[in-house]
Structures are given as C-alpha cells and as structure tokens.
Amino acid sequence: MRYCMDFESTLVPLEQELTYVDHYLCFQKARFPGRFVYSIHAAPELREVHIPKMLIQPVVENAFKHGHMQNRPNGFILVVAEYDKDSLVLSVADNGCGADEDALQALRCRMEQKDSGTGVSDHIGLLNLSTRIRLHYGQGALLTFGNRSRGGFEVSIRLPRSEA
C-alpha cells in the first residue's frame, strides 16, 4: 500500500515495479492457493530503467477481475519486460477466459477517439493506462491488447526506448 501511496516518485526503476507486482501475485496466491502459477522475466540490464509507477500491476489485476484466474485450475500469468528494437515492451499474458471480441473492438474505438469513457466503468483501467503512457511518452507509446491464440488474454505496453 505504501508503494502506491508514495506520490513523490512518479517514475520508479522497473525492478521496483516488478517487486510490487511479485508481492501482489504472492498475495493472490495466498488468497487462492493452488489455483495459478506465475512467472516474471526481465533482463538484468532493464531492471534500472525508470517507468511510471503502477504501470504493470493494474494489468495483472485485470487477469483476476476479467480473466477469472482465481476460478480456473492451472491458471498461469506471465509478466515479461524486454527490449524490441527501439522500444521497451512490457507484457502481461494469462490463460484465463479471454474477452468478448465485440467488447474489445468497442474498447479499441474508445481508445482511438481518446474517449475517457466518462460514466462507463468497464475497462477503465486500460483506458487510464493508455492515457497515462500517452501523456508521459507522447505518440511513441502504445498499449495493445487482445485474446491469445492459445486462449487467455495479453496486454502489451510499448514505450520509446530513448525515453524509458
């Protein structure tokens, strides 16, 4: 709780953000023992890269809220941070129930129109995240999401390498 309430530091090392995500997932494992496993991967050279605080945890939280990971046997969540050409890519994938394609398309349209979804409570986390990265990094930042071909859902956050 102290981590997210510290308003003095808006940028944190990736290592710190991943530690917070790890603590969140440990807490969820205690709540739902034996229901899922998780893995967090980041190359050592990325661990000191600074990113906006609370960038990854809300996406992981969505795996429980929308993917129903706590209700599925053999659930899996994968968090990866890696460089891809000129971008830092942060991705969260799960093997949950995925999402309805019509709802995904509607959300993509709202993001393209920069519609904050006033009065709408669905997917506010992804809309907020998209707005935050665009405000901080400009048009070079990108949030993508969709169902995985093998089932589940994946969210990728692409940040310009020179700024990350």
Residue spans for each PLM region:
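C-terminal end segment of the histidine kinase catalytic
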Residues: 147-164
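Two-component histidine phosphotransfer core
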Residues: 1-146, 153-154
